[in-house]
Amino acid sequence: MDAVIDTSVIIEIFRGNKDTLYQICDYNCKITSITVFELYCGNLKENEMIMIDSLPKLNFDDKSSKIAGNIFKKLKKEGKIPSVKDLLIASIFY
């Protein structure tokens, strides 16, 4: 089964959290291009970069950008302003 893992999950794995690793070990894990950006903003070790680069990626594309824009407008009308990074990640799966 496929699973998309978020930045916080990867950071927990990098910190040595074995419980987190065991929870995802039976899945075919993927990350988004937005998650790659978030991780590369930090101070990654070489082995962490290799792990990130080895995971399959789901990319933010033209379709995702339109979806994100429409979701943002809808939420803004409702008085809610979402986290832009979370909105971009969510739009990849919509």
From Swiss-Prot:
EC class of the enzyme, as a word: hydrolase
GO terms for MF: metal ion binding; RNA nuclease activity
EC numbers, comma separated: 3.1.-.-
Residues reported in the UniProt entry to bind Mg(2+): D6
Keyword NAD: no
InterPro entries from the UniProt entry: PIN-like_dom_sf (IPR029060), PINc/VapC_TA_RNase (IPR051749)
Record-given protein name: Ribonuclease VapC3
Source organism of this protein record: Methanocaldococcus jannaschii (strain ATCC 43067 / DSM 2661 / JAL-1 / JCM 10045 / NBRC 100440) (Methanococcus jannaschii)
